């Protein structure tokens, strides 16, 4: 066919030619359909707009004409004068009526509350309707109140009231402990003022080191002199700081001359220095021995906690801290007092032991089981169990060996024996059958005499004092690798003197993992202890646990004295503390002495600043105890919290190394202790030990890596020393809002949940008084109380301070010690703030406060009115809703509460309870769930939630974006997978109703839909619920297009912010934030995993272009779908405090396999490729695709960071085949998510990776895992022991039922309570068990029952010891307490009064009791010492003893009758098979 004919035919309209192909048909069809629709819509729109404008114009013209006519009429009536205008009468009536009703508001409220006056109320309603009164029905909003100024600012007042010289003096000598005012004034008499000009030396090398220098004005520089003659600046001492060495202080007091060997000090400018000679302390110490001992103890604690902590944990120095004296071969290692025959016999015995065939390995007991003070009745089981963990290193149990090898008891309760240190089986024989005849041929008396004389000289005692020390010295023979004490053991602390052989001192690696620390093979060798040397003095003086593990390197003989014996010797000879301290100081290396001049121990009160912004950074700080807050001040003056630091954190290290000025101000949140490491000391150590540089590089790398993962894209804008706010607290104060709050059961429940994470301690005022004495809260005992509390905090991962219901000294102490304050209230009661709560806020202005609202488990409704609670308490930073079991709200006496929870603590806690969620939050182990956006694919979230629930993973926090915001909000609101599934299915069905969506269509200027019907579906799902009222903490993320950033919503209207997070661009308009008017879009545009609940859910679903942006009702900002910024906000969840995060991503994936089309691109070529079926297709994004990819740029980058993070478990179900709007496939998509999630978590469980989600664990377990009571490891005040001050009340089983008291075994995990098989049960007085009666007599009854058992124990005969287990104490040792006739009069009178009351009570109630009633099972308690009294009563001891004996006889007769009744009843119970264990005593068993 001719081409011209074809073209002519085409022009004439004949399309049956070459151009009549597929593409022309497609184009014509599309044009026709779209033209019709758009034409119709445009026509309808034009008509509507014209009609609207016409009527609006017509109405305005009518209004203008009417106004003109009215004005003209009034003008004519008043003669043309406008001043004659008056209000109409009806307007006046409306005005005065409304005014009257405002005045009568209170009266009307009373009428409504009284229920009377129906006619009056009817009149009021009629008047309100006539007067057109309208109530504002605005939702309750969260008051955005800035924290008080004290929260972010330091305290500056208070220092001007003290003269500068006295203030600096007080601050400088505080390192020696607490001094009373008379002692301080005596020290001030010896001070001297030194005037120094610039360049003058304060001291030089070879000058005596015998003074404390305090800079009053000016500046002093301390230098260190190297061997080559060069000098290096060690630190700069400014006004108020001091130059001293505590190690030289001990040298001076010990009588040793001390000189400056490598340190000099020079004045940099004109300075005034206060000089305090160290000899001034000697005068004070002679008059007050207790002050001397306390100062030595403080110095040793500073040495261990400051010097060793800084140099070992942060600089990686271990062996460099101690001198390792090497012995010359052939020298005589044994003291010259040992005769020659003894040496030869000892060497023969050693060779015999070395050549003896190896026996079975000696197992050692674990640090949890082994104690010297409380022997285990079955040591072999625990030893075998520990041997599997700690390898083959044998361990010697000195106590058990002592019990098996010796039958004589010395004066101190210790056994004098020199038998071989080999394990014994039954019958006292060794496993190889050779017995204990290894050194029987050695003269025991000479060896013992040599040991006594050696230890006497080491302790600085004279020959006349031999009789004092001789009863306590013990000698042992050790085989190689025998362990004397393990690191962290506090019970087996002794003073060891090496007679022959060598001991090796080890320490665990600070960087080792948890498993590596438990393996003794990974311990680092510190130094050797050779013959003639002593070890163990540091732990003896500090009273803390041993910092080292000591093992025998070879066959050795040691002489040792136990801790209790040392303290008895110390009472008679207090100055032995100087010799013990001097022995510790002699062992230290010169590096430690140089560091002692530079390192400072700083005490900061709450509100004081460590350093300020823009100051020079010349030092770094180590937080020893307390809490610090870092605050940055912006150029406009606004302050913002950058981070918080807790115990063990390093503050200011980055700024010091980079030599930049301080970027933030760091202040103390509560009373804190810090170690100051100057830059000069850091440089000196760095030059001498290059390994320090490697250590710091590793430390800083981990810090920056964590900061990058935490802050993500905002890392560049954060300060250099930024540390995100951590939610891991070490001390928690519990404050009841009102008296009816069950604070004691609440503390028990929280303690029960915390025990599953690690060792926890619960402290009350009663516990502290019984442990430290009734006068412990006085000012004179400040040091003892502070040191004891600090030691308890070091032992436990968290300490609970239960406050009193009044502003007592104990409550004030709790506020000073707390890292966070939990304000506990009843959620269903009034939200009003009481006077006590306001006083609490004044006491701890800088401490973070969190509100805990309790609800009974029987409640069916979700929490409500939370906003009222929060608005009334602007100081609260976070709130928790806790659902409580029934036993918490049951009214019981303190005795019954303690008895109830003694059984509860034996069970495992419910890890899914709200108490467990709160426990994980406090310890920094919260588990977060992040749900990403993806439209209809979000139905997979429901299946994943079910799989998570079946895997046993608790959910502590939930965050979501877009559809994930909707599903997450449903879970936080219901917490029931069935209800959540039902509501999600109903919402998905509504989204499939196309006729509702057609009615929601609008002119597409901002979006295709108006969003009205979409809002209604979300509002119907949630109702008017606020985010604050959800059971689980929840947040959603939206895109704020007004401020061009993402916004995190943790409070406000739920449905609105969910709607905002689902506002996808182009489909719905952005949501306008009512707070600030900002426009919010879907949060997935910036981050796709993260008032009234529905509003923010709606805001999070505002898809741009589909739904309009949602306007925030708070500020007016426009909110869109959060997927534009962050579609999986796991980083936001991590910043909010979640430690372990599960992130579920259901978003669509972009195609990255695109065609490379070269340097230029022709649209015609793409059109040809697309419409030509005979060519290969190309993958080039079109314009809408490019716009979409640009919108999701930040989201994709954020998602990659989440995938590579170590805190997040990223999960993506296989739902790519489902479209974004396929809401009709809800059940199918849900099943896909469930099957995938179930298989995924099953594989994680098999691989061992599920434990961090569904099993509680302790990242840093304590050195000892079994703390049965506070007595096992407690603060030891040497001054109290030496000076025989009033002794403390030991916590034992006797005190467990006193008010607000703990149980024996209550301090550790609940499983340790299984060891306490015997508890006392005492019947109540009276016959009624009504809770309305006063039950304060329970504690008195327990005391009476205890005295009855005491009287019985004193009259009984001790049974024969158990031969099979020689270590088991006899009954004479296990009595409750002894009442010797030489007892002090006051104690006897107290017991006598109790016995008289018990005797009278029994005589009165004997004829009333029914003998057929079942009696309670009774048990004995563990042995416990009775506290001594310090005063004498005027009563005669003889009369008291006679009367006491008489009452004992009467009591014994009563007991014989009671025992016979009890035996008969037990026989009857055995016949019926109803005998129960003491642990299973129920509440009904307490009936009398």
UniProtKB/Swiss-Prot annotation:
<feature type="compositionally biased region" description="Low complexity">
    <location>
        <begin position="344"/>
        <end position="356"/>
    </location>
</feature>
<feature type="compositionally biased region" description="Polar residues">
    <location>
        <begin position="415"/>
        <end position="424"/>
    </location>
</feature>
<dbReference type="GO" id="GO:0005789">
    <property type="term" value="C:endoplasmic reticulum membrane"/>
</dbReference>
<dbReference type="GO" id="GO:0045494">
    <property type="term" value="P:photoreceptor cell maintenance"/>
</dbReference>
<dbReference type="InterPro" id="IPR056556">
    <property type="entry name" value="NTE1_P-loop_dom"/>
</dbReference>
<keyword id="KW-0378">Hydrolase</keyword>
<feature type="region of interest" description="Disordered">
    <location>
        <begin position="1348"/>
        <end position="1376"/>
    </location>
</feature>
<keyword id="KW-0443">Lipid metabolism</keyword>
<dbReference type="GO" id="GO:0046470">
    <property type="term" value="P:phosphatidylcholine metabolic process"/>
</dbReference>
<feature type="region of interest" description="Disordered">
    <location>
        <begin position="1398"/>
        <end position="1488"/>
    </location>
</feature>
<feature type="topological domain" description="Lumenal">
    <location>
        <begin position="1"/>
        <end position="34"/>
    </location>
</feature>
<keyword id="KW-0597">Phosphoprotein</keyword>
<dbReference type="InterPro" id="IPR000595">
    <property type="entry name" value="cNMP-bd_dom"/>
</dbReference>
<comment type="function">
    <text>Phospholipase B that deacylates intracellular phosphatidylcholine (PtdCho), generating glycerophosphocholine (GroPtdCho). This deacylation occurs at both sn-2 and sn-1 positions of PtdCho. Its specific chemical modification by certain organophosphorus (OP) compounds leads to distal axonopathy. Plays a role in the signaling mechanism between neurons and glia that regulates glia wrapping during development of the adult brain. Essential for membrane lipid homeostasis and cell survival in both neurons and glia of the adult brain.</text>
</comment>
<feature type="topological domain" description="Cytoplasmic">
    <location>
        <begin position="56"/>
        <end position="1488"/>
    </location>
</feature>
<dbReference type="GO" id="GO:0016042">
    <property type="term" value="P:lipid catabolic process"/>
</dbReference>
<dbReference type="GO" id="GO:0007608">
    <property type="term" value="P:sensory perception of smell"/>
</dbReference>
<keyword id="KW-0524">Neurogenesis</keyword>
<keyword id="KW-0442">Lipid degradation</keyword>
<dbReference type="GO" id="GO:0072657">
    <property type="term" value="P:protein localization to membrane"/>
</dbReference>
<dbReference type="InterPro" id="IPR001423">
    <property type="entry name" value="LysoPLipase_patatin_CS"/>
</dbReference>
<feature type="domain" description="PNPLA">
    <location>
        <begin position="929"/>
        <end position="1095"/>
    </location>
</feature>
<comment type="similarity">
    <text>Belongs to the NTE family.</text>
</comment>
<protein>
    <recommendedName>
        <fullName>Neuropathy target esterase sws</fullName>
        <ecNumber>3.1.1.5</ecNumber>
    </recommendedName>
</protein>
<comment type="subunit">
    <text>Interacts with Pka-C3; interaction inhibits the catalytic function of Pka-C3 and the esterase activity of sws.</text>
</comment>
<feature type="short sequence motif" description="GXGXXG">
    <location>
        <begin position="933"/>
        <end position="938"/>
    </location>
</feature>
<dbReference type="InterPro" id="IPR050301">
    <property type="entry name" value="NTE"/>
</dbReference>
<feature type="compositionally biased region" description="Low complexity">
    <location>
        <begin position="402"/>
        <end position="413"/>
    </location>
</feature>
<dbReference type="InterPro" id="IPR018490">
    <property type="entry name" value="cNMP-bd_dom_sf"/>
</dbReference>
<feature type="compositionally biased region" description="Basic residues">
    <location>
        <begin position="1399"/>
        <end position="1410"/>
    </location>
</feature>
<dbReference type="GO" id="GO:0034236">
    <property type="term" value="F:protein kinase A catalytic subunit binding"/>
</dbReference>
<dbReference type="Pfam" id="PF24179">
    <property type="entry name" value="NTE_Ploop"/>
</dbReference>
<keyword id="KW-0472">Membrane</keyword>
<dbReference type="GO" id="GO:0007272">
    <property type="term" value="P:ensheathment of neurons"/>
</dbReference>
<feature type="modified residue" description="Phosphoserine">
    <location>
        <position position="1176"/>
    </location>
</feature>
<dbReference type="GO" id="GO:0061024">
    <property type="term" value="P:membrane organization"/>
</dbReference>
<feature type="region of interest" description="Disordered">
    <location>
        <begin position="402"/>
        <end position="440"/>
    </location>
</feature>
<feature type="short sequence motif" description="GXSXG">
    <location>
        <begin position="960"/>
        <end position="964"/>
    </location>
</feature>
<feature type="binding site">
    <location>
        <begin position="458"/>
        <end position="587"/>
    </location>
    <ligand>
        <name>a nucleoside 3',5'-cyclic phosphate 2</name>
    </ligand>
</feature>
<feature type="binding site">
    <location>
        <begin position="576"/>
        <end position="703"/>
    </location>
    <ligand>
        <name>a nucleoside 3',5'-cyclic phosphate 3</name>
    </ligand>
</feature>
<dbReference type="InterPro" id="IPR014710">
    <property type="entry name" value="RmlC-like_jellyroll"/>
</dbReference>
<dbReference type="GO" id="GO:0034349">
    <property type="term" value="P:glial cell apoptotic process"/>
</dbReference>
């Amino acid at each position: 066919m001719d081409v011209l004919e074809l073209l002519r035919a085409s022009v004439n309209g004949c399309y049956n030619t070459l151009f009549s192909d597929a593409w022309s048909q497609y184009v014509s069809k599309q044009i026709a359909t779209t033209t019709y629709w758009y034409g119709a819509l445009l026509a309808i729109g034009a008509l509507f707009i014209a009609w609207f404008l016409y009527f609006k114009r017509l109405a305005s013209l009518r209004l203008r004409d009417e106004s003109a006519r009215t004005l003209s009429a009034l003008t004519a009536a008043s003669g043309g004068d406008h001043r004659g205008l008056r209000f109409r009468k009806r307007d006046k009536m409306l005005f005065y009526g409304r005014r009257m009703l405002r005045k009568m508001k209170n009266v009307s409220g009373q009428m409504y509350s009284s229920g009377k006056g129906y006619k009056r109320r009817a009149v009021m309603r009629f008047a309100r309707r006539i007067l057109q009164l309208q109530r504002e029905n605005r939702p309750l909003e969260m008051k955005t109140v800035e924290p008080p100024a004290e929260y972010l600012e330091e305290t500056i007042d208070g220092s001007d009231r003290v003269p500068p010289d006295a203030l600096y003096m007080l601050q400088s000598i505080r390192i020696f402990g607490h001094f009373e005012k008379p002692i301080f004034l005596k020290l001030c008499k010896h001070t001297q003022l030194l005037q120094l000009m610039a360049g003058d030396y304060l001291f030089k090398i070879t000058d005596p080191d015998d003074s404390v220098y305090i800079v009053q004005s000016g500046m002093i520089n301390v230098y260190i002199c190297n061997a080559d003659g060069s000098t290096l600046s060690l630190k700069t001492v400014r006004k108020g700081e001091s130059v001293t060495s505590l190690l030289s202080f001990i040298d001076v007091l010990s009588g040793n001359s001390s000189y400056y060997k490598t340190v000099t000090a020079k004045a940099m400018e004109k300075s005034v220095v206060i000089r305090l000679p160290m000899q001034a302390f000697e005068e004070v110490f002679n008059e007050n021995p207790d002050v001397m001992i306390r100062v030595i103890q403080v110095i040793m604690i500073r040495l261990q906690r400051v010097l060793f902590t800084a140099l070992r944990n942060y600089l990686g120095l271990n062996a460099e801290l101690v001198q390792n004296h090497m012995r010359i071969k052939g020298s005589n290692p044994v003291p010259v007092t040992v005769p020659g025959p003894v040496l030869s016999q000892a060497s023969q015995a050693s060779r015999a032991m070395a050549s003896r065939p190896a026996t079975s390995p000696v197992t050692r007991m674990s640090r949890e089981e082994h104690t010297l003070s409380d022997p285990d009745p079955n040591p072999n089981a625990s030893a075998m169990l520990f041997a599997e963990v700690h390898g083959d290193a044998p361990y010697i149990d000195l106590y058990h060996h002592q019990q098996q090898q010796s039958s004589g008891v010395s004066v101190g309760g210790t056994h004098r024996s020199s038998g071989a240190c080999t394990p014994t089986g039954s019958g006292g024989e060794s496993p190889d059958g050779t017995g204990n005849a290894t050194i029987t041929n050695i003269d025991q008396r000479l060896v013992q005499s040599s040991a006594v004389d050696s230890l006497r000289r080491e302790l600085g005692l004279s020959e006349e004092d031999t009789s004092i020390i001789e009863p306590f010295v013990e000698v042992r023979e050790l085989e190689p690798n025998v362990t004397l004490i393990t690191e962290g053991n506090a019970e087996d602390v002794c003073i060891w003197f090496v007679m022959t052989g060598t001991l090796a001192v080890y320490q665990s690696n600070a960087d080792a993992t948890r498993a590596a620390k438990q393996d003794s093979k990974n311990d680092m060798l510190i130094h050797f202890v050779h013959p003639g040397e002593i070890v163990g003095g540091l732990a003896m003086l500090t009273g803390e646990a041993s910092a080292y593990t000591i093992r025998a390197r070879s066959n050795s003989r040691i002489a040792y004295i136990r801790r209790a014996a040392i303290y008895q010797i110390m009472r008679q000879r207090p100055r032995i503390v100087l010799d013990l301290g001097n022995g510790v100081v002699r062992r230290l290396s010169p590096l430690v002495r140089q560091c002692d001049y530079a390192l400072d121990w700083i005490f900061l009160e709450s509100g004081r600043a460590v350093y300020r912004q823009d100051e020079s950074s010349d030092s770094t700080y180590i937080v020893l105890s307390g809490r610090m807050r870092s605050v940055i001040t912006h150029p406009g003056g606004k302050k913002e919290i950058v981070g918080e630091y807790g115990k063990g954190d390093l503050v200011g290290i980055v700024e010091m190394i980079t030599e930049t000025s301080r970027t933030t101000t760091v202040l103390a949140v509560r009373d804190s202790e810090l170690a100051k490491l100057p830059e000069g000391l850091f440089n000196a150590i760095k030059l001498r030990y290059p390994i320090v540089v490697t250590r710091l590089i590793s430390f800083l790398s981990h810090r920056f890596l964590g900061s990058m993962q935490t802050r993500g894209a905002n890392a560049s804008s954060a300060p250099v020393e930024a540390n995100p706010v951590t939610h891991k607290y070490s001390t928690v104060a519990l404050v009841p809002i009102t008296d009816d709050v069950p604070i004691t059961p609440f503390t028990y429940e929280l303690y029960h949940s915390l025990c599953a994470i690690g060792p926890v301690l619960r402290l009350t005022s009663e516990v502290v008084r019984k442990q430290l004495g009734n006068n412990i809260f006085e000012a004179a005992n400040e040091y003892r109380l502070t040191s004891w509390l600090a030691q308890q905090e070091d032992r436990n991962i968290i300490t609970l301070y239960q406050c009193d219901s009044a502003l007592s000294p104990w409550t004030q102490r709790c506020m000073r010690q707390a890292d966070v304050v939990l304000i506990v209230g009843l959620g269903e009661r009034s939200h009003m703030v009481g006077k006590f709560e306001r006083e609490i806020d004044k006491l701890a202005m800088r401490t973070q406060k969190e509100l805990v609202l309790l609800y009974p488990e029987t409640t069916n409704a979700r929490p409500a009115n939370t906003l009222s609670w929060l608005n009334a308490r602007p100081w609260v930073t976070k709130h928790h809703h806790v659902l409580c079991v029934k036993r918490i709200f049951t009214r019981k006496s303190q005795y019954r509460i303690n008895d109830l929870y003694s059984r509860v603590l034996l069970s495992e806690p419910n890890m899914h309870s709200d108490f467990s969620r709160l426990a994980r939050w406090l310890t920094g182990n919260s588990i977060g769930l992040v749900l990403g956006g993806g439209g209809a694919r979000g139905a997979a979230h429901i299946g994943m939630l079910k799989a998570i629930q079946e895997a046993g993973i608790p959910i502590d926090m939930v965050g979501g974006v877009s559809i994930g915001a909707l599903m997450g909000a449903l879970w936080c609101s219901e917490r029931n997978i069935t209800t959540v599934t039902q509501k999600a299915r109903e919402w998905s069905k509504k989204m499939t109703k196309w006729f509702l969506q057609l009615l929601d269509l609008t002119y597409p200027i901002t979006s295709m839909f108006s969003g009205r019907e979409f809002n209604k579906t979300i509002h119907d799902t949630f109702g008017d619920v606020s985010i604050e009222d959800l059971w689980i903490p929840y947040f959603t993320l939206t895109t704020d297009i007004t401020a061009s950033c993402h916004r995190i919503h943790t409070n406000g209207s739920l449905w609105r912010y969910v709607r905002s997070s689902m506002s996808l661009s182009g489909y719905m308009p952005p949501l306008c934030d009512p707070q600030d008017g900002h426009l919010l879009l879907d949060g997935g545009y910036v981050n796709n995993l993260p008032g009234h609940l529905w509003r923010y859910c709606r805001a999070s679903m505002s898809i741009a272009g589909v739904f309009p942006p949602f306007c925030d009702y708070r500020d007016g900002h426009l909110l869109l779908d959060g997927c534009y910024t962050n579609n999986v906000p796991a980083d936001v969840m991590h910043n909010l405090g979640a430690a372990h995060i599960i992130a579920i991503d259901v978003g669509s994936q972009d195609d990255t396999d695109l065609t490379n089309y070269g340097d230029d691109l022709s649209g015609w070529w793409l059109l040809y490729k697309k419409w030509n079926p005979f060519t290969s297709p190309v993958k080039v994004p079109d314009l809408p695709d490019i716009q979409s990819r640009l919108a999701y740029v930040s989201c994709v980058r954020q998602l990659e960071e989440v995938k590579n993070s170590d805190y997040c478990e990223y999960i993506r179900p296989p739902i790519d085949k489902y479209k974004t709007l396929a809401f009709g496939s809800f059940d199918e998509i849900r099943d896909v998510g469930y099957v995938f999630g179930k298989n995924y978590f099953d594989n994680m469980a098999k691989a061992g990776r599920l434990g961090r989600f569904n099993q509680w664990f302790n990242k840093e377990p304590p050195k000892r895992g079994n703390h049965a009571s506070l007595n096992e490891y407690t603060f030891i005040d040497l001054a109290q022991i030496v000076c025989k001050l009033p002794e403390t009340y030991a916590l034992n089983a006797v005190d467990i039922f006193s008010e607000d008291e703990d149980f024996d075994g209550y301090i550790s995990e609940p499983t340790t309570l299984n060891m306490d098989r015997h508890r006392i049960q005492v019947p109540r007085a009276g016959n009624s068990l009504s809770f309305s009666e006063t039950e304060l007599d329970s504690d008195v009854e327990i005391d009476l029952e205890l005295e009855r058992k005491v009287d019985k124990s004193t009259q009984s005969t001790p049974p024969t010891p158990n031969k099979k287990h020689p270590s088991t104490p006899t009954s004479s040792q296990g009595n409750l307490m002894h009442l010797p006739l030489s007892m002090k009069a006051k104690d006897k009178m107290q017991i006598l009064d109790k016995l008289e009351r018990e005797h009278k009570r029994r005589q009165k109630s004997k004829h009333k009791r029914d003998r057929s009633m079942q009696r309670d099972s009774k048990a004995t308690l563990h042995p416990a010492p009775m506290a001594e009294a310090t005063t004498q009563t005027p009563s005669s001891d003889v009369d008291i003893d006679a009367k006491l004996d008489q009452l004992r006889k009467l009591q014994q007769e009563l007991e014989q009758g009671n025992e016979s009744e009890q035996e008969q009843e037990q026989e009857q119970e055995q016949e019926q098979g109803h005998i129960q264990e003491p642990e299973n005593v129920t509440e009904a068993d307490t009936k009398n």
